[in-house]
């Protein structure tokens, strides 16, 4: 968050684009205010291998595998060639991960209870 305030330009990637009324209904969930954002891009699964709460889980198996990969420069180069430079875009990356990983990262829906913040 602090990096966004210090940046000259901020391109925000979002799991979901929602109406302004949704954001205003719970402003405490806004991490980066619009005043510092230059562009917003809809990029599902952009947090992988990390998680996006309510969308998908943390890919712990990825992090364990990365520990091994990152032990050598050659293995790291091979990984980057395959998974970063070797995919056309984020969608191709997600498809390359495959259905088994997609399924493993699914999280059950658990809606929060409404809270009255008053009119904003």
Regions found by a protein language model. Give the residues of each.
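Metallocofactor- and cofactor-centric catalytic cores in central/energy metabolism, strongly enriched
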Residues: 1-120
């Amino acid at each position: 968050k602090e990096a966004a305030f210090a940046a000259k330009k901020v391109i925000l990637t979002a799991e979901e684009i929602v109406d302004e009324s949704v954001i205003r209904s719970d402003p405490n969930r806004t991490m980066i205010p619009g005043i510092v954002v230059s562009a917003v891009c809809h990029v599902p699964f952009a947090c992988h291998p990390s998680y996006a709460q309510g969308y998908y889980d943390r890919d712990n198996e990825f992090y364990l595998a990365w520990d091994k990969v990152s032990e050598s420069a050659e293995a790291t180069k091979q990984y980057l060639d395959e998974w970063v430079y070797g995919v056309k875009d984020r969608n191709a990356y997600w498809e390359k991960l495959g259905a088994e990983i997609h399924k493993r990262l699914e999280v059950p829906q658990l809606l929060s209870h409404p809270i009255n913040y008053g009119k904003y």
